[in-house]
Swiss-Prot record:
GO terms for cellular component: cytosol. Catalyzes the irreversible cleavage of the glycosidic bond in both 5'-methylthioadenosine (MTA) and S-adenosylhomocysteine (SAH/AdoHcy) to adenine and the corresponding thioribose, 5'-methylthioribose and S-ribosylhomocysteine, respectively. Also cleaves 5'-deoxyadenosine, a toxic by-product of radical S-adenosylmethionine (SAM) enzymes, into 5-deoxyribose and adenine. It holds the Pfam family PNP_UDP_1. Keywords: Amino-acid biosynthesis, Hydrolase, Methionine biosynthesis. SUPFAM superfamilies: Purine and uridine phosphorylases. Its EC number is 3.2.2.9. This is 5'-methylthioadenosine/S-adenosylhomocysteine nucleosidase. It catalyses: S-adenosyl-L-homocysteine + H2O = S-(5-deoxy-D-ribos-5-yl)-L-homocysteine + adenine; S-methyl-5'-thioadenosine + H2O = 5-(methylsulfanyl)-D-ribose + adenine; 5'-deoxyadenosine + H2O = 5-deoxy-D-ribose + adenine.
Length: 233
């Protein structure tokens, strides 16, 4: 089985890359692929670049050229739900776009025409993650939460951005800039996927400071959780 893992930034893939054995690097159209093994599993690790277009491009290249049987997205996210703290992990059971509006034609806010309104994380992978992380976080000050992640081509920190997202997605847990695009490509290629992100900021007016300070913590937390999951796949 080949497992695809995608992170947007160098910081988000560094720990995973350093955990790989027999690493081969390939660059295609600016997307950096690292091919090797983690936890005795064949892995294709992608540093895609930031934003939905980079994520979609890289995921498409991965799906077409490397044929992964599973795709996992790692990285950081901004927490939107009450009670979340930096270092908590969000496992997405659903994903949506927060900046797509074709409602005049009868679509749900966030829905790309002729695509689902929400992209569903793979139920089998979700179940495995839930079992693993219940034990993993039992003695930790952080926690794993499950729910809706919303993707925007903007860094969310202003009250007006919050208001729009909460109006259309009142149960949102976290926001970020790539996951729904990865999910859409995985959906179109019929590849099971799971989004595992760690909270780097609380998507508020201190978010830029928090992100810069805690991106490495969030990346480490997310990557560590993924390595634990790989041991069970």
């Amino acid at each position: 089985m080949t497992i695809g893992i995608i992170g947007a930034m160098e910081e988000e893939v560094e720990l995973l890359k350093n955990s790989m054995s027999s690493v081969e690097e390939i660059v295609i159209g600016g997307a950096k692929f690292y091919i090797g093994e983690i936890a005795s599993k064949e892995v294709v690790l992608l540093e895609s670049g930031i934003g939905k277009v980079n994520a979609a491009l890289g995921t498409t290249l991965m799906a077409d050229r490397f044929k992964p049987e599973v795709i996992i997205n790692t990285g950081s996210a901004g927490g939107m739900a009450e009670g979340l703290a930096v270092g908590d992990v969000i496992i997405s059971d659903r994903l949506a776009y927060g900046d797509v509006d074709v409602t005049e034609f009868g679509y749900t806010y966030g829905q790309v025409p002729r695509m689902p309104a929400f992209y569903q994380g793979d139920a089998v992978l979700l179940k495995k993650a839930e079992t693993i992380y219940r034990e993993y976080f039992a003695t930790s000050e952080n926690k794993a939460v499950y729910g809706l992640v919303v993707t925007n081509d903007s860094f969310i920190m202003r009250p007006d951005q919050h208001e729009i997202i909460r109006t259309f997605f009142p149960d949102v847990k976290a926001v970020e800039m790539e996951a729904a695009a990865i999910a859409q490509v995985a959906y179109q290629f019929d590849i099971p996927f799971l989004i595992i992100r760690a909270i780097s900021d609380l998507a508020n007016q201190e978010a830029t400071i928090s992100f810069d300070e805690f991106i490495h913590l969030a990346a480490k937390q997310s990557a560590t959780c993924i390595i634990e999951l790989l041991k069970t796949i």
